[in-house]
């Protein structure tokens, strides 16, 4: 059970769950600077720089990795692994959306979109509409910041400012969503912030709204062993002050580590979808982005990338 969450909590881009979107965007910004980048997000740095978290802007420093290496080489390996994970995850779901577009799907829904910039940076076919669902202040920050820099979406982008714990299907319909058309859904970086029951309800609603031929891609919620989680927390504390990261939220305090959470692929297979999964570590290995860690990671602590098609 999360210790910092309540049933009706809200946030903006610099607080609570909202700040995790800045963390992820910082990882995309770092990846974009690499010569061998798996993805290119030219807008991530802009979104991080203006967020005002006072924390993740630090990661934009080109010397950040070297500073960690000097303080704690093993921690540097962990940070490199985390950055590679974000790059591989983004790469996987970018490919998912390109395949959906190639299949003729023109209705896109991004659940808890955060600072996702796909509406702006992917080469969407004409006639594509991207619906982004998230907290009102998060959506407002993203669109306003990019607009200030003269950046406009490639696809038709429609904001759906609503909490996924409330009546988001009505808000989605009000924004123009057509349930009779095939949809490509995305739940990336979301499930760990939902209780197990809310996860089931989310997929029930998505299924109700999905015409035959619809697709969904999901990042599952990994479950880290308690001792490993505590060890990581203590290691982070050792150098956080020296890197201006001491005010960073403890992400583990925001997630719901529910042991009875349904297996996503099994749930989808049982409810009218045909699903398959790729474990994150296997995908990282395939793309030559698997970093050797000081402790052999438990596969259960890492996500599986699930894709499915509505029958």
Curated annotation (Swiss-Prot):
UniProt-annotated binding residues for S-adenosyl-L-methionine: 134, 163-164
EC class (word): transferase
Record-given protein name: Putative S-adenosyl-L-methionine-dependent methyltransferase MSMEG_0095/MSMEI_0092
Record-listed E.C. numbers: 2.1.1.-
Recorded family membership: Belongs to the UPF0677 family.
Any Gene Ontology biological process: methylation
GO MF annotations, alphabetized: methyltransferase activity
Pfam families: LCM (PF04072)
Keyword line: Methyltransferase, S-adenosyl-L-methionine, Transferase
Highest taxon in the source lineage: Bacteria
Function recorded in the entry: Exhibits S-adenosyl-L-methionine-dependent methyltransferase activity.
Entry annotated with the keyword S-adenosyl-L-methionine: yes
